[in-house]
Every structure is written in structure tokens, then in C-alpha cells.
Amino acid sequence: ERYGVEIQETPGCAAERIAIKIGDQVHDLQDNQLTEFVDGFHQFFAESKAVWELPYNSHHTRDAIVECDALTVADRLNALQLTPLQRTAVGGMLEILSMNQPANASYVEMMRCWSLTGWNYELFNDTAARYKFTDGTGALVDAIVQDGGFEVALNTSVVSVQQTANGVSVTTTNGEVVNAKRAVVTVPLNVLNSVAFDPPLSSVKQEASALKHVGGGYKVFIEVDGDPGAVMTLSRSTDSPLIGSFTYKRGQKHSVLAGFSLEPGALEKPLSEWQTVLEEFLPGVRLLSTFGHDWGVDALSQGSWCTYRPGTFGRFVDELPRHEDHCFFASADTSEGWRGFIEGAIA
């Protein structure tokens, strides 16, 4: 609202049709199954209100959070008597949210995300995926730059940050040195160790960057012929290379779906193979192309969105955003609330 950046609804996140693969069979979710579908999430997250009563203030229930810290999503799923539909819906959705296998994903981190949206499935879906910037994230960046009068240097990597009594000296790969009284560090957690800090960062920050968060996988955009409608697909990674997808942009001649995959090399997968995969969910669909960016191999990210590993919250959550002399740490990867989201980066 501050900048008047236009937003629009993502069609598939208000889906008219949900195709869900349970085992080796694809079914269209029926109206009489919606209660069962949503109830699976309420069962999985039944403890979240007590554990994350105030999701923007983890100190409020820190003991309860730390008590669950070592648990994985797989641990929680195995403890519940969910129906096959619920197990696929919850498991698949959380594979997308964590961008990793349930055995590697943190139960605490998933509860945090659920609590941020008021323990409500509809708000969870709307907040996490339903709305997007009409002109992309770049429109927001441009508005912030114009408002603040900043100078932006693209394709300019930082190799070192040296602190002195008077401030900081930031050196880029091309040898340019920028001197300032303070530095706000928004480098993603997974590449923080690629910058040489003098004096060195705390041992905990170095440990966290070396360990890395669990966010991996691939976001694969799929261009299809015609208009498939406002559709969503859902599966488990053990049952399909496509754990989920939704209509991202509709058009009469061609449309685009946003898909998610944990399969290695998903972006290099031949179009013919993706055709077979998607047609299982949407019979008759014809793929035109696939595209996306490999954030895992990108030297400036080395991963997708951030969620901490099981058992690391208690060690990392207070230390990662703690300032060190003239360096202040304020990335989405260290945000107290919307960690891993653009809201966390802004906050």
C-alpha cells in the first residue's frame, strides 16, 4: 500500500479444480472431500497454537519451541492416523513449503508458517501463494529505490567486509571499495561464508552458513497450449516428480503453470517427460516449454527459500540476526516472523 504496487490473483491458488495423486492414482478433489482435506492440516498443526502462540516473538513460548525443535515433518506425519488423502495433501504441501523431503524438514518451522496465518487453511493458502505483484518483484524494488534515493549496483558481488573503529569497508569482486559507517547485510544464509569478514563473524553464524538451510528443489514454470483453467495439482515426491503446480497465468492461446519438484535436474528434464508427468494430472494438456532458474547452483543463493534444519532453531534463531559492531543482519533468512518470504526480507 505504501508504494501503490499493483497486485493480482494467481488463478490456480483459487482453483476450480484440484487434481491430487494418491499412490499411483490421480483423483479430482470432490466437494464432499473438502472437509477431510482441510482437517488433515488441522490435525497436523494441532499443537501449533501452544507452540507458536506469538509467531513474531519466539521468546514468548521458547521452551515449547525448543522442546519440538528436533522433530521432523516425517516424525509428525508418522505419529498421526491420517487418511490417504490427508497424508498426500499435507505431505505434498509441506514438501513445497520446505522444498525438501519430510525427513529433512523442520516440524517447528512448518508450525511457524501455519501460525503466521492464524491457524487457518484458507488464510494459509491466500497468504503463501494466492497474490503476486502484477509487474513482478522488480516493481517493488524499483519503488523502494525511488523512495529511498539509493544507488543500486547489479552484478556486483561482495568479497570482503572489513570493520574499523570508524565503520566498514566493503570490497567488491571488481576491486571497488565502499566505505560507510554501517553495513546492512542481507546476504542469504547459504552464501554468508563466501564473504570474508574481518573480524570474522561469530562461530554460530559461520556454523549456520556452513550447514545451510534445507530449502532446495526447483520451481519449474510450464507453458501449455490454450487455457487449462484455474487448476492445482498435488502429489508426494515419492509418487511424482511434480509435487505440486497451479495455474500462474491464463491466456486463450497459451498459459503458464508454476510447478515444484524435488527431482534432481528437474529444469533439464526433457519436455516429453514433463508432458507425460503433467498429462497424468491434466489429460489432454499439451506442453510448449518449461523454464526456471536453478537457485541451488546460483552462486548468490545456493538454495531456494529458507527454513532451518530440524534441531537448529534453538542455536541459530537469536544469533543470526544479532548485529556485530557496525554490521547489521537483516535478510529474509534471519527474520523472526516471515522467514523465507519476501515479507521477512522487508520486515
What is each PLM-predicted segment?
Residues R2-A19, P84-G91, G229-S235:
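A short alpha-helix-loop-beta-strand transition element characteristic
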Residues D31, G167, T233-A347:
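Conserved flavin/dinucleotide-binding core of flavoenzymes
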Residues Y56-S157, A165-G167, T186-P188, A196:
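Active-site/ligand-binding neighborhood in enzyme catalytic cores
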Residues T173-R182:
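Core beta-strand elements of the Rossmann-like FAD/NAD(P) dinucleotide-binding domain
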Residues V204-A230:
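Central beta-strand plus flanking loop segment that forms part of the substrate or channel wall
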